[in-house]
UniProtKB/Swiss-Prot annotation:
Required cofactor(s): Mg(2+)
GO terms (BP aspect): polysaccharide catabolic process
Protein name: Carbohydrate deacetylase
Keywords (A to Z) from UniProt: Carbohydrate metabolism, Hydrolase, Magnesium, Metal-binding
Bridged cysteine pairs (disulfide): none
One Pfam family per UniProt: YdjC
Gene3D superfamilies listed in its UniProt record: Glycoside hydrolase/deacetylase
Length: 245
């Protein structure tokens, strides 16, 4: 089995950025995805450049922070912040989404790095119209998209992706070391597997703005756990990133 352990939310805060790098240096994190509309995006970029073997994709955002684009009125509230998920689904115009996603992608490229792949914050590309915009970018740049089966396998025609994607490594009940070992053991026959994770340290930004806080620290502990690393080595699981699929 070839495993991509992808850490979402790179760029959301300095503490999260540093935690992701810890998971890469001393654990099994192989890949991350960068949020380009955050105050600490450039902090994450600098860390990525110092750790060039870490795969870095783009985490396209519609539901956190503020847009990079002007005049995308269907995406924002009265204060100029992105709408929450449900409101976004009701309000968002596809052309505004296209403008914003392209601006986020151009922002990523402006840092002088090439994204390994695309995924989205809160899996907004599981919405069919949003997926089409993401697919445009993926095809233009010949990069993979995170595999969301609910959108339909036919949507991934001519788009690179992993064989399987797992998002259940999440919440305290599911992120103990043995739970991750069991998850890996159950998928040993899969060719390429991406597991989503959210490791990190905590700071005031996360504590004040994220509903998912303490479990990030626990995830980091599990992703650097000696028993987990030993299991991966014993089972000859190949740790890769999206450049390898």
């Amino acid at each position: 089995m070839r495993l991509i352990m992808n850490a979402d939310d790179f760029g959301i805060s300095k503490a999260i950025n540093l935690g992701i790098i810890e998971g890469f240096k001393n654990g099994i994190v192989t890949s991350t995805t960068l949020m380009c509309n955050m105050e600490t995006t450039e902090h994450a970029v600098n860390l990525a450049k110092e750790n060039s073997k870490l795969g870095v994709g783009i985490h396209l955002v519609l539901t956190a922070g503020r847009p990079l684009s002007k005049n995308v009125k269907t995406l924002v509230d009265n204060e100029g912040n992105f709408l929450k998920y449900d409101k976004m689904v009701e309000s968002a115009c596809i052309e505004d989404i296209r403008i914003e996603f392209r601006n986020q992608f151009e922002k990523f490229l402006s840092f002088g790095i090439v994204p390994t792949h695309i995924d989205t914050h809160h899996h907004v590309h599981s919405i069919e119209s949003v997926f089409e915009v993401v697919a445009e970018l993926a095809k233009e740049h010949n990069i993979p998209i995170r595999h969301i089966k609910a959108i339909g396998e036919e949507k991934y025609e001519n788009i690179k992706t992993t064989t399987e994607f797992i998002d259940s490594f999440y919440n305290l009940s599911m992120i103990e070391p043995q739970m991750l070992i069991n998850l890996l053991d159950d998928n040993m026959n899969v060719d390429s597997l991406e597991i989503m994770c959210h490791p990190g340290y905590l700071d005031s930004k996360i504590l004040s703005s994220s509903s998912y806080a303490y479990p990030r620290v626990k995830e980091l502990e599990t992703l650097t756990n000696k028993e987990v690393i030993q299991f991966i080595n014993e089972k000859n699981i190949e740790l890769i990133n999206f450049k390898d699929i």
